[in-house]
């Protein structure tokens, strides 16, 4: 039976040296980003295979782009929540070392909403000259980003946070909310590659495609002695297997989820409830870890 003791968790945290967090849709639920597989998941009305596969895009790029335009608009309107901010703060060595001295940390997120990097900007705002460690990286977005636009022909990738991304999709997010999609938007009116002019696609990792940075992730998972599972039901591989691999290697696993899932079997600690409440409380980070004038080299 997993422990629910914050004191015991903090003792493990204090002694951990190589920490990873594996995050899923539940991390962003409190920000108003709909989850896919929960009871209220927005995919309940649609076939996921028709919306999140290369084959689905080839069959109906208009339908797929309307769906991802809806997700882009939702992400642009969303605010980061306390769990995003806690993980961002924990990524900064000076802050993290107050509760986990001498440790490294990487957040491996399955989310594509861009809220984790936005949270880091919020945490770092006003800190002149602060830099984050590059080895290991503080964040890996293994399933890509909603705001990356990838060419279907030349593979050019470009960050585009414009709203709407193109005039042909303007207002269609309201149709998605009503579960009425218009499949008749001409292909020439969908997003195009700014380099070669060909049809572009959302720059996310679809089912059947290879997630980003797998060799690096495998190395981090193999070294990890503590894995935080945050807002994920541990059903999508390879991420679903990371916690069990850490556990098999002798590391500890702490799960922060709204409700119990199959992934709890590997947990040493289980904190149920919204992770925007449970995670900051469990980490116990100081409110103000350093002065405004702290030298960048110490961070």
Swiss-Prot record:
**Catalyzed reactions:** N(6)-malonyl-L-lysyl-[protein] + NAD(+) + H2O = 2''-O-malonyl-ADP-D-ribose + nicotinamide + L-lysyl-[protein]; N(6)-succinyl-L-lysyl-[protein] + NAD(+) + H2O = 2''-O-succinyl-ADP-D-ribose + nicotinamide + L-lysyl-[protein]; N(6)-glutaryl-L-lysyl-[protein] + NAD(+) + H2O = 2''-O-glutaryl-ADP-D-ribose + nicotinamide + L-lysyl-[protein]
InterPro entries the UniProt entry points to: DHS-like_NAD/FAD-binding_dom (IPR029035), NAD-dep_sirtuin_deacylases (IPR050134), Sirtuin (IPR003000), Sirtuin_cat_small_dom_sf (IPR026591), Sirtuin_class_III (IPR027546), Ssirtuin_cat_dom (IPR026590)
Give a yes or no for keyword Nucleotide-binding in this entry: no
UniProt keyword Cell membrane present = no
Superkingdom assignment: Eukaryota
Catalytic site: 143 (proton acceptor)
Subcellular location per the Swiss-Prot or TrEMBL entry: Mitochondrion
Query: What keywords appear on the UniProt entry?
Result: Metal-binding, Mitochondrion, NAD, Transferase, Zinc
Transmembrane segments in this chain: where?
A: none
**What is this enzyme's EC?**
2.3.1.-
Family per UniProt?
Belongs to the sirtuin family. Class III subfamily.
Name of protein: NAD-dependent protein deacylase
């Amino acid at each position: 039976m997993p422990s629910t003791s914050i004191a015991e968790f903090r003792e493990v945290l204090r002694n951990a040296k190589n920490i990873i967090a594996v995050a899923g849709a539940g991390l962003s639920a409190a920000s108003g980003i709909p989850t896919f597989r929960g009871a209220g998941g927005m995919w309940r009305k649609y076939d996921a295979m028709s919306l999140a596969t290369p084959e689905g895009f080839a069959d109906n790029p208009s339908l797929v782009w309307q769906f991802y335009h809806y997700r882009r608009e939702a992400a642009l309107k969303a605010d980061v929540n306390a769990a995003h901010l806690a993980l961002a703060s924990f990524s900064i060595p000076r802050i993290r070392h107050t509760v986990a001295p001498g440790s490294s940390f990487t957040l491996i997120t399955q989310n594509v909403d861009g809220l984790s990097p936005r949270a880091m900007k919020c945490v770092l705002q006003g800190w002149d000259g602060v830099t984050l460690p590059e080895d290991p990286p503080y964040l890996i977005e293994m399933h890509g980003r909603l705001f990356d636009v990838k060419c279907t022909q030349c593979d050019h990738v470009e960050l585009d946070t414009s709203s709407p991304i193109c005039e042909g999709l303007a207002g269609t997010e309201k149709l998605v909310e009503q579960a009425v999609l218009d499949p008749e938007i001409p292909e020439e009116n969908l997003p195009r590659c700014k380099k070669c002019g060909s049809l572009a696609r959302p720059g996310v990792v679809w089912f059947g495609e290879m997630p980003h940075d797998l060799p690096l992730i495998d190395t981090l998972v193999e070294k990890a002695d503590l894995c935080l599972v945050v807002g994920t039901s541990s059903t999508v591989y390879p991420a679903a297997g990371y916690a069990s691999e850490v556990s098999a290697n002798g590391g500890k696993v702490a799960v922060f989820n709204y409700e119990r899932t199959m992934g709890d079997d590997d947990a040493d600690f289980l904190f149920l409830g919204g992770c925007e409440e449970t995670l900051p409380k469990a980490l116990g980070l100081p409110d103000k870890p350093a002065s405004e004038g702290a030298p960048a080299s110490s961070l």
